[in-house]
From Swiss-Prot:
Transmembrane segments: none annotated. Pfam families: HIGH_NTase1, HIGH_NTase1_ass. InterPro entries: HIGH_NTase1_ass, Rossmann-like_a/b/a_fold, tRNA(Met)_cyd_acetate_ligase. It comes from the Archaea. This is Uncharacterized protein MJ0951. Belongs to the TmcAL family. Signal peptide: none annotated.
Amino acid sequence: MLIGEIMDLNLKNFLEDREEIIRDAKRKDEKSFKDFKKIVEEIKERENKDKIVCDFTEYNPLHKGHKYALEKGKEHGIFISVLPGPLERSGRGIPYFLNRYIRAEMAIRAGADIVVEGPPMGIMGSGQYMRCLIKMFYSLGAEIIPRGYIPEKTMEKVIDCINKGYHIQVKPYKIICIETGEILGEKLNIDNYVIASMSQMIYKLNREGLKFNPKFVFVKRLEGISGTKIREAIFSGKFEDIKNMLPKTTLSILKELYDNGKLNELILKRFEDRILETANEYDLYEYLPSNVAEILEKKRPFNNIEEIKNSLPYGFSRHFRERILSKLEARIPNETLSKYINNYPAKIKILAVKL
């Protein structure tokens, strides 16, 4: 397949995702929830397990650290992976390495029982997608949430707090146990911060009437695994360099794609022309925070993506600029995204099931 044809197909999929997000802002697919519950009951009976374990991971790609956490989770029940998918933009705001259907297959081969589609992380702030994530866990019936963590002094206090049934509040340079008021520390590693944010969002949504109290299972992260190194090696076909970081199932999928000459054409990329068109010609107040829209509209026209990025202010998140590019790429109005989050999940979309 020619490069132009590949980009056309990827753009077609991207635009279909966009339309689906817009539709999901104003509808509920009740049948999808019933169908999902039926499948869960069948798997519970087959596996002779009664608990539902849910985790949220990008699997970009799935490595041994992911598999280790998955195996620890499966000790407690059937395992459901929530895989962010629509628009194929990561929490960092950049395109995923491979599409969600390939990543879902990696999860199934690694041992997951079901993979469902999660929220479109790349166009959301961390609070927005955390809200969607917890609401999805609730809708899936999650009873146990396994999470990998990096050992550090403040994190040990966070774990102790959560294990007591308490919740965490995250403030700039202050991590607090909500119920006791104890200051646990000043900051956390970014991966540990996700756990604290999940706890905080559960508390917040329960205050809004959700009634969700899952048990966390904390899994110490495996050392010596780098997602960046894995992706760099895959780009160059150096699978021997990373065979100790990837489970055989992931390695098999990647090598098969590489040997068949399909890997490079499946690697996802930005639609830079679309971003430039939005930045130069559209009403940016419709899609971006007003302060960002004001800056970009004053500085346009732009000739390339770097000019846009260099014009953007620094946000609270280090991925702020890339997320703004994803917003320009997606052209989903702020009002529509807000309705989408309020209505989330509009459906349970199953990406893969273990047969």
